[in-house]
Amino acid sequence: MENGALNQGEGKDPSSFLSDIIGSRVIVKLNNSLVFKGELQSVDGYMNIALEKCEEWVHGKKKTVHGDAFVRGNNVMYISADDSA
């Protein structure tokens, strides 16, 4: 890591990158446009994701606080770091 920033790692596969950022805050956007923000707790080979301190966001506004959430990998459009935390 350089200057404390998350290094996406050139040549790394996505599951290795996600394993490296376990414990960090992430944004998960689903194929149906729902957005979840939370702390990444685990990811498996199917890209299934477990989040803690999870919040559901709709149209840029926090809708619901779920606490813990499990997201099935085939529903995920993208995962990114949550720099707003």
UniProtKB/Swiss-Prot annotation:
GO CC terms, sorted: nucleolus; P-body; sno(s)RNA-containing ribonucleoprotein complex; spliceosomal complex; U4/U6 x U5 tri-snRNP complex; U6 snRNP
UniProt keyword terms in alphabetical order: Cytoplasm, mRNA processing, mRNA splicing, Nucleus, Ribonucleoprotein, RNA-binding, rRNA processing, Spliceosome, tRNA processing
Every Sm domain range: 13-85
Locations listed in the record: Cytoplasm; Nucleus
GO-annotated molecular function: RNA binding
Keyword Cytoplasm set for record: yes
Superkingdom classification of source: Eukaryota
CDD domains: LSm6
Main location: cytoplasm
PANTHER family, alphabetized: SMALL NUCLEAR RIBONUCLEOPROTEIN F SNRNP-F, U6 SNRNA-ASSOCIATED SM-LIKE PROTEIN LSM6
Subunit structure: Component of the heptameric LSM1-LSM7 complex, which consists of lsm1, lsm2, lsm3, lsm4, lsm5, lsm6 and lsm7. Component of the heptameric LSM2-LSM8 complex, which consists of lsm2, lsm3, lsm4, lsm5, lsm6, lsm7 and lsm8. The LSm subunits form a seven-membered ring structure with a doughnut shape.
Protein task: Component of LSm protein complexes, which are involved in RNA processing and may function in a chaperone-like manner, facilitating the efficient association of RNA processing factors with their substrates. Component of the cytoplasmic LSM1-LSM7 complex, which is thought to be involved in mRNA degradation by activating the decapping step in the 5'-to-3' mRNA decay pathway. Component of the nuclear LSM2-LSM8 complex, which is involved in splicing of nuclear mRNAs.
Similarity section: Belongs to the snRNP Sm proteins family. SmF/LSm6 subfamily.
Protein name from the UniProt record: U6 snRNA-associated Sm-like protein LSm6
Organism, as annotated: Sclerotinia sclerotiorum (strain ATCC 18683 / 1980 / Ss-1) (White mold)
Gene: lsm6
